[in-house]
From Swiss-Prot:
It is found in: Cytoplasm. GO terms for cellular component: cytosol. Its EC number is 2.7.4.8. CDD domains: GMPK. It comes from the Bacteria. GO terms for molecular function: ATP binding; guanylate kinase activity. It catalyses: GMP + ATP = GDP + ADP. ATP binds at residues 10-17. This is Guanylate kinase. Transmembrane segments: none annotated.
């Protein structure tokens, strides 16, 4: 059976990456697709682990070649998901998770209408501001731009299937795991996964 595509998006500072990493540690059945980006690595980030870091020229070349499943300009830098990291895995029956922004999520839903999408929100604007400032990686001007962009991004939460409020980290991770479990228990998925059993029960 074909794998399920999961989309997780959030404004910067909402804790998306931490929640995704903790969830994947609990649920090894899902593979994380590593995005490409034209921005420079931040302290502690490693190529091919956090992102595939490429130049803006290389990214534009990949766009021209049709290499991307989705891509978008985010905070002045390009980010995208390569087709090769998604389509073959889904066809082979593997579940794939995309950690992307709302623009990319919109593109993906147009291509894969049955993708399961999750949006993560902070518990308050104050919490969002504090979390972003704790990173200490950006100047005040860049921080102000990111905060304004985050508020704009949150307007798109209604486009998603599920919404998680990241007030308590462990609770948010448990809720993400529950979404994955519920997705696997949908009737269509169970009919495909247990076709033989269901047929035997009904004969």
């Amino acid at each position: 059976m074909r794998g399920t595509l999961y989309i997780v998006a959030a404004p910067s500072g909402a804790g998306k990456s931490s929640i995704v990493n903790a969830t994947l540690a609990r649920d090894p059945k899902i593979a994380l697709s590593i995005s490409f980006t034209s921005r420079a690595p931040r302290p502690g980030e490693r190529h091919s682990e956090h992102y595939h870091f490429v130049s803006a020229e290389e990214f534009q070349g990949m766009i021209a070649a049709g290499d991307f499943f989705e891509y978008a300009l985010v905070h002045g830098d390009w980010k995208g998901t390569a087709r090769q990291s998604v389509e073959p895995q889904l066809a082979a029956g593997h579940d794939v998770l995309l950690e992307i922004d709302w623009q990319g999520a919109r593109q993906v839903r147009q291509k894969v209408p049955d993708a399961v999408s999750v949006f993560i929100l902070p518990p308050s604007r104050q919490a969002l501001d504090e979390r972003m400032r704790k990173r200490g990686q950006d100047s005040e001007d860049v921080m102000a731009q990111r905060l304004a962009a985050a508020r704009e991004e949150m307007l798109h939460f209604e486009e998603f299937d599920y919404v998680i409020i990241n007030e308590t980290f462990d609770t948010a991770v448990s809720e993400m795991c529950a979404i994955f479990t519920a997705s696997r228990l949908r009737r269509q998925a169970q009919q495909q996964r247990h076709a033989g059993l269901i047929q035997a029960l009904l004969d």
